[in-house]
Regions:
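Non-catalytic architectural context of zinc metalloproteases
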Residues: 1-64, 77, 121
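Hydrophobic alpha-helical and helix-loop surface patches within well-folded domains
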Residues: 14, 49-248
């Protein structure tokens, strides 16, 4: 598509069920790859679009990470209900139903560091994971950020460890939040704080609830009981609008 131009026009019509938002991307420069993956007995198409500059990273990892994320999240919540999941290489991370935008590029010579690779894998897991929270379990992210970002970051942590049990997860492990929790009390806020008033937004809306859920699963309730309850929450509130009492 980069070799020639056409003056002809074409109309594409897309139809999606049970979505609350949408996005699309178009470029003559994008590389596309895809793979079918079995998610809880259903075939889903995992796809990636990326610029040539991102080829060394995205060609090797992106679509595989998309497929892995769908399987991991589906095992911990409900089966992924959509027919496709798409990762698009971009300047930063953002999520929409069935499509998300993620960062990470190789150097001009095609090499990349472990930090860049792991950052790309982590953001793809996180943004694809947003299909489940808040696109499927449709909480109000403007009112209760932790129900969206916190639960998603917790599932991201589990998916990262299932991808590689030595993955350097930044949010989820208990020891990673110690420095934040040692900060002066006037810089700490309850998780239930309204989204628009949160200071230290990343640690409070992402890391603190993710870490709390991890501790609840590993230390307090145990995996079997926690996993049953977490899956039941997702099942009950799929395509509905839960508030904090519904989770508790």
């Amino acid at each position: 598509s980069m070799q020639g131009k056409s003056s002809a026009t074409k109309t594409w019509v897309f139809d999606a069920q049970n979505v609350r938002d949408f996005a699309w991307v178009s470029s003559r420069r994008l590389v596309w790859d895809a793979m079918a993956t079995n998610v809880e007995g259903k075939k889903v198409m995992a796809m990636s679009y990326y610029g040539p500059e991102a080829y060394p990273l995205y060609n090797r990892y992106s679509t595989k990470v998309v497929a892995h994320t769908l399987k991991s999240y589906s095992a911990h919540t409900i089966p992924y209900p959509y027919p496709v999941a798409i990762s698009v290489e971009a300047a930063n991370g953002m999520e929409y139903p069935m499509i998300c935008f993620n960062y990470g590029r190789a150097e001009k010579d095609g090499t990349y560091s472990e930090t860049v690779k792991n950052g790309m894998i982590g953001v793809i897991i996180h943004e694809v994971g947003h299909n489940f929270f808040p696109m499927i379990v449709n909480s109000d992210e403007r009112q209760w950020s932790w129900m969206d970002e916190g639960l998603n970051t917790f599932c991201q942590f589990m998916a990262e460890q299932e991808w590689d049990n030595n993955f350097p997860s930044n949010r989820g492990p208990a020891h990673k939040i110690v420095d934040y929790m040692k900060m002066p009390k006037n810089q700490l806020e309850p998780i239930m704080t309204n989204s628009e008033n949160i200071i230290q937004f990343g640690p409070n809306a992402y890391a603190k609830p993710a870490t709390a859920l991890n501790i609840l699963r590993e230390t307090i309730m145990g995996r079997e009981l926690f996993d049953f309850a977490f899956k039941e929450y997702a099942r009950r509130w799929a395509f509905k609008h839960p508030t904090p009492p519904d989770l508790f």
